């Protein structure tokens, strides 16, 4: 009788064919969506910018390229007050966009990009389970994966074509590499995550602080080596690209919606909003310094909880960002869920289900109720607050259990000692 391994070796093409069929079906659905729903401006910006450099040798940071992007999006150059749709990522981000920039049909390129982002959301969900050791039951697992793709902070960057989904995957992959001692891989993944530097700057600084406290110098070394190679290789095509990129970064807040809580507060309460923003920055900065010092030389569980807190608080600390980037907060959310089930079992599972439903329905309802239309749906600044506020409260709620060895591990050791 043939073994199962022999059977699989002979009929491996069956699951491969099923996977390919699903991939083609999803891409076809994305293509039809792209045809019927123009947009995906986050992707459009970098698709045009990469093609300009690849086919014309033109810097993606140039005004000429910005006007090309605006014409494709608006049918004309951007008017005062409209989003200028300029390339603001580091030039080495084009590594991600290059395969798609080779496709001249924008709708097809966008459809394939969306398929890749959908794969990224699934991978992020898998990494969340591996990082936290969470083993939800079958029905909760199905809801978990549906939530990962369809919740507001997952589906919106998917539709817009935001590369932040890949940044979240790279961060989660770096955490896994750090836990398993693969420091070289962690450094490389962290370097590539800097394609959206404002999203990862504080988590990367904390990771370096923690790894250096453990004398794990290879993380810093490989991060630096990778960044130097990426920067130098791009300088072969645009020698002064770091200066051009810096100009775009400084220009970015001028044509974007409020990108910090302080900017949001200033719009709501002009008399005191800016001071409130600086006060929030100071409070969060002090908290992070204290938590970083507490995590110094501690084990991975303590480090991981602090990294999740850093990721959440960095969205409010005053660095320019956008609620469209909040998919990076999926991993802290999974940590909270994992601790709840670990501590409270069945009651924890019901709590997880209730919170998922509340987050899913609440964020979408808030977006729909507050949306404005400026040629494309524009989210209200109020979306800066619900998820980070919940996560800060929830992370401190589970802190005691999250930073210590899991209950299952302790019980296993106790049983071993009794033998």
Task: Report residues per predicted region.
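Central hydrophobic cores of alpha-helical transmembrane segments
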Residues: 189-190, 222-228, 306-312, 349-361
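Hydrophobic alpha-helical transmembrane segments of integral membrane proteins
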Residues: 11, 95, 140, 193, ...
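Membrane-embedded alpha-helical segments of transport systems
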Residues: 195-199, 228-233, 358, 362
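Primarily membrane-embedded glycan-assembly and transfer machineries that use lipid-linked glycans
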Residues: 2-178, 183-184, 209-330, 339, ...
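Aromatic-enriched
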Residues: 335-419
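Membrane-embedded alpha-helical segments of multi-pass membrane proteins
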Residues: 115-120, 165-170, 196, 200, ...
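Transmembrane helices and adjacent periplasmic/lumenal helix-loop junctions
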Residues: 190-209, 318-325
């Amino acid at each position: 009788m043939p073994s199962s391994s022999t059977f699989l070796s002979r009929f491996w093409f069956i699951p491969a064919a099923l996977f390919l069929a699903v991939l083609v079906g999803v891409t076809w659905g994305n293509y039809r969506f792209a045809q019927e729903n123009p947009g995906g401006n986050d992707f459009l910006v970098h698709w045009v910018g990469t093609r300009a450099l690849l086919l014309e040798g033109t810097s993606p940071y140039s005004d000429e390229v910005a006007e090309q992007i605006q014409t494709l999006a608006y049918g004309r150059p951007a008017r005062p007050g409209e989003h200028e749709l300029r390339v603001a990522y580091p030039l080495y981000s084009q590594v991600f966009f290059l395969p798609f920039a080779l496709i001249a049909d924008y709708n097809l390129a966008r459809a394939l990009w969306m398929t890749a982002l959908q794969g990224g959301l699934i991978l992020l969900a898998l990494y969340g389970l591996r990082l936290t050791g969470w083993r939800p039951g079958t029905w909760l697992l199905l809801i978990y994966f549906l939530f990962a793709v369809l919740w507001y902070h997952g589906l919106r960057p998917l539709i817009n074509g935001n590369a932040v989904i890949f940044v979240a995957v790279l961060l989660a992959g770096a955490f896994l590499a750090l836990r398993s001692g693969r420091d070289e891989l962690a450094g490389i993944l962290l370097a590539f995550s800097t394609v959206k530097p404002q999203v990862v700057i504080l988590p990367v600084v904390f990771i370096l602080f923690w790894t250096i406290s453990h004398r794990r110098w290879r993380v810093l070394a490989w991060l630096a080596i990778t960044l130097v190679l990426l920067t130098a290789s791009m300088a072969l095509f645009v020698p002064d690209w770091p200066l051009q990129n810096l100009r775009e970064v400084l220009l970015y807040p001028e044509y974007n919606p409020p990108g910090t809580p302080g900017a949001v507060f200033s719009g709501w309460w002009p008399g005191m909003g800016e001071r409130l923003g600086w006060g929030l920055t100071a409070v969060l900065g002090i908290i992070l310094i204290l938590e970083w010092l507490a995590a110094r030389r501690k084990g991975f569980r303590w480090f991981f909880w602090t990294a999740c807190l850093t990721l959440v608080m960095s969205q409010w600390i005053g660095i320019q960002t956008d609620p469209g980037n909040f998919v990076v907060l999926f991993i802290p959310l999974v940590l909270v869920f994992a601790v709840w089930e670990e501590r409270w079992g069945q009651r924890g599972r019901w709590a997880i289900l209730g919170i998922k439903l509340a987050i899913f329905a609440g964020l979408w309802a808030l977006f729909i109720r507050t949306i404005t239309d400026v040629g494309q749906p524009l989210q209200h600044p109020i979306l800066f607050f619900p998820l980070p506020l919940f996560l800060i409260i929830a992370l401190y709620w589970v802190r005691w259990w999250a930073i210590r060895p899991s209950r299952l591990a302790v019980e296993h050791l106790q049983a071993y000692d009794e033998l």
